[in-house]
């Protein structure tokens, strides 16, 4: 019956095409010779799923398979013979998942299990990796965390009151990411960690804000006074140096990526540095916060620059057609004077050397973000960046490190530009004493302060930008750069 219906549908489609004189193949400039040259075969690989099957056909197929899954006895029936063959062929053709990981190493098997959403198998494989003392490479680690796409839900509980309600699948994902962190050697050694009846145990917020009135920066953005009061030197000395169309971005986006540059007159930093203090986090290894890195007026000048040129939404293209705005951004390559002044302020508080790799400076490519309620940066691990720059003819250079002395970042440098909002903590996750549980350590943003923590090859830290509940949060993401090759003898 299924074959008959399919045949009738195809015949009807063919008849409709022959009855419609407007659908005529263009032959004026064919992309391929027809017929193709002797001895050659041409294979077309569709780029879009909808060129092969319609969205409706795909939905019907998924619904049919899900329905039959509930009744395994029916799948064995004679009527399902052709379906079983088709499903087998589909599975054999699939280039992802466990089917293609047979005989591969444990890292590849975990990747395949996650692709197939076989989370129990993934946890078993991760346990084996831990027993064998194997650790995933950074690329695999970042991919696993990205694929799991864990949502903490912490922004839904104001003032740390109450527990987050999670679905069974969300609880499972947290258990898997806990296993991932344990394989990498992460653990919470805090004997006084708060225990909660939840898969994510929220710990006390680390709050270094001074006991002084908070500047209402976002209110001045909304009423237009912040940009209106910005000096003309800002408006005259900021320019676009590169635009990447949305579809060409990685991953593709609904909006273009616009890269700005500025002269030293645009956003000048004071030559008299503020009184910066630096404190390591009491629990999270490698995490520290420096306060008074920027003056409040310097923070507001950066926000004014972003608002003047307009923050651009970050909305990745999705196959399902949904639009999810992560944040609004302002990409800015700071001038050399700005870099040198800021580096002189923060350099005393970063490790001079990591395994013989010397610290060299800050990545001049600043990603300035504006977060509002509904936009949050889910749990992730930061990747490493080279130091970016600008050529003499005003061209952007992704990797501007010296050819003979390549550099790459080892620390994230997260600068907070305001604090007049609710929520919006930067939250760090560690495996708790009990397996399957994560302890969450929130850090409250301080205007003009900066969080510094490891990424890349050195003890990369799982963290999130917890959602803002009220107001708007402005923050800069950049990196601390180090030599790729060690130049000092590493003492053992």
Spell out what each predicted region is.
Residues 2-450, 456-492:
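Fe(II)/2-oxoglutarate oxygenase catalytic core
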């Amino acid at each position: 019956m299924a074959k008959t219906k399919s045949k009738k549908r195809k015949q009807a489609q063919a008849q409709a095409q022959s009855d419609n004189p407007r659908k005529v193949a263009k032959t004026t400039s064919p992309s391929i010779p027809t017929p193709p040259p002797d001895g050659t075969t041409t294979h077309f690989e569709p780029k879009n799923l909808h060129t092969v099957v319609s969205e409706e056909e795909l939905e019907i197929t998924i619904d049919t398979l899900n329905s039959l899954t509930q009744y395994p006895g029916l799948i064995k029936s004679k009527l399902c013979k052709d379906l079983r063959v088709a499903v087998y062929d589909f599975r054999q053709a699939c280039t992802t998942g466990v089917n293609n990981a047979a005989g591969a190493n444990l890292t590849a098997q975990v990747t395949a299990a996650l692709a197939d959403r076989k989370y129990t198998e993934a946890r078993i494989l991760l346990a084996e990796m831990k027993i064998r003392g194997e650790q995933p490479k950074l690329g695999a680690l970042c991919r696993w965390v990205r694929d799991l796409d864990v949502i903490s839900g912490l922004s839904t509980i104001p003032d740390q009151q109450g527990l987050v309600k999670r679905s069974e699948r969300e609880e499972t994902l947290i258990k898997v990411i806990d296993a991932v962190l344990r394989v990498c050697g992460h653990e919470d050694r805090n004997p006084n960690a708060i225990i909660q009846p939840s898969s994510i145990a929220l710990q006390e917020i680390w709050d270094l804000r001074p006991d002084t009135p908070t500047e209402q920066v976002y209110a001045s953005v909304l009423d237009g006074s912040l940009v209106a009061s910005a000096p003309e030197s800002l408006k005259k000395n900021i320019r676009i140096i590169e635009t990447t169309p949305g579809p060409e971005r990685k991953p593709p986006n609904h909006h273009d990526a616009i890269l700005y540059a500025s002269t030293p007159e645009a956003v000048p930093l004071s030559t008299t540095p503020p009184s910066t203090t630096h404190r390591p986090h009491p629990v999270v290894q490698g995490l520290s916060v420096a306060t008074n890195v920027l003056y409040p007026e310097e923070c507001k000048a950066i926000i004014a620059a972003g608002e003047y040129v307009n923050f651009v939404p970050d909305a990745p293209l999705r196959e399902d057609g949904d639009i999810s705005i992560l944040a609004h951004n302002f990409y800015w390559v700071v001038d050399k004077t700005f870099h040198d002044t800021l580096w002189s302020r923060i350099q005393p508080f970063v490790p001079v050397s990591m395994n013989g790799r010397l610290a060299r400076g800050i990545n001049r490519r600043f990603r300035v973000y504006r977060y509002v309620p509904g936009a949050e940066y889910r749990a992730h691990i930061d990747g490493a960046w080279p130091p970016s720059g600008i050529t003499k003819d005003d061209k952007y250079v992704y990797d501007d490190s010296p050819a003979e002395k390549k550099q790459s970042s080892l620390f994230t440098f997260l600068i907070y530009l305001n604090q007049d909002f609710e929520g919006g903590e930067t939250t760090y996750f560690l495996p708790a004493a009990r397996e399957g549980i994560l302890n969450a350590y929130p850090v409250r943003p301080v205007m003009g302060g900066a969080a510094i923590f490891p990424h890349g090859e050195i003890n990369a830290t799982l963290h999130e930008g917890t959602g803002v509940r009220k107001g708007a949060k402005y923050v800069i993401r950049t990196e601390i750069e180090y030599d790729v090759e060690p130049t000092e003898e590493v003492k053992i």
